Amino acid sequence: GKISMKKRSRIIPVLCTLLVATFLFGTVSATNISMIGNTVTEPPLTQEELEHISECNALIEQQLARDNLTRAIYNNYLSMSVITQENGYYCGPATACMVAKTLGLGTYTQKEMASLLGTTTSGTSGAQICNTLNSLLSKTSDTRRFQRVTISTAALETSVRSSLRNDFPLTLNVKEMPNYTSGSGHFIAVKGYYFNTSTDFKTITICDPHPTYSGTYTYTLEEMETAVESSNGYYNRLDASTV
């Protein structure tokens, strides 16, 4: 039916408030941050890459088996500073900048790194990050290289231990984080870990470039496994054959 002028005067401000809120924040949700987006399709692993991952997994098992004979607690933390991404699709460049600086490969602006990566408004792929960082490493005396893997082809726990025991960071593609949900995909860097194999207490420390939640955070191993699985499952670790 018809709305009286008195009722209409009360409704209009409410509607305006809702419209403004929707425009500024999108769908209201405490955990859905719509400004984050990385929709680039990750190229599938080739047969050659899969075979090399298996070879590296065997090398890692040998390395860690020797470690397990001497102690039950393992931990290492890299000196990595958080870089907050400048826009909604620069999580890849920001993460690559953090890793490059940590490895002594130079200090890049996010725009410079985005150019090297080939980042578009759709974001960046893990393959682009892996290849670009390896290209920068090849220009130094550092023989270590990144290897692109999936959580189904390489266990995150052993990858983290292997990489960080060699002072080498990892990059993860995540979606469902413990404190927020990315609309599509989001890159973060792993800077440290603490694993107690006798009590099964295991944590991973990451640097997150998220424009709202940027910072250093520590989560359980299980939480980070879930975060990677919720996205495309890809991440970049140390190629164990290059150590």
Indicate where each model-derived feature is located.
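Short, well-ordered loop/turn elements at secondary-structure boundaries
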Residues: 6, 19, 85, 165-167, ...
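Conserved active-site-adjacent core of cysteine acyl-enzyme catalytic domains
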Residues: 32-50, 54-69, 73-78, 111-243
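Short, Lys/Arg-enriched N-terminal segments with co-localized hydrophobic residues
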Residues: 1-4
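Sec-dependent N-terminal signal peptides of Gram-positive bacterial secreted proteins and lipoproteins
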Residues: 8-30
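Active-site nucleophile-adjacent alpha helix/oxyanion-hole segment immediately C-terminal to the catalytic cysteine
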Residues: 73-120
